[in-house]
Amino acid sequence: MSWFAIRVTYGRELKFKQLLNDAGFECFVPMRKKTVEKDGRKVILTVPAVANLCFVNSEKSLLDKFMRSFGDSCWGRYIWDKATRKPIIVPDKAMDDFIQISRVMSDDVLYLKEITSKLRQGQKVRVVKGPFKGVEGTVVRIKRSRRIVVELPGMLAIATTYVQPQDLELM
């Protein structure tokens, strides 16, 4: 089983995730909290953090069969690796770390769509304490604070909130 990145059309991430869950697939849509004003009151909503993105843990053949059952009207399509011309498969450890960071749903967690060489230059570390315990990534300074960046190859990266130096272990 592998984690596949799926591009979902027209903001239907949660509906597509529900369809997949009902069919027995393991899915993940990164979420964040958003404050909106409704009738003069502030309301906190939980919305997808990255537009049109869903991750599915499955055998490719089963996922293909599910998506083909909708014909051309399927809401999801694989995100392709341009170099290999195959669907992007996210490594299990990177996906586990991504999910762990995403579930914190803090305003300080950043989703980075552009992965620059600066993000790859930091030291490789493992978090040994706190809400991100077990996460492995690269230490990078973003917005004046030391954060751990976990990259999903070929797609995006996620940066944690500030992590204390004593909570880190060099790899």
Give the predicted meaning of each segment.
Residues 1-121, 138-171:
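Acidic-enriched and Gly/Ser
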Residues 128-135:
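Short coil-to-beta-strand transition motifs
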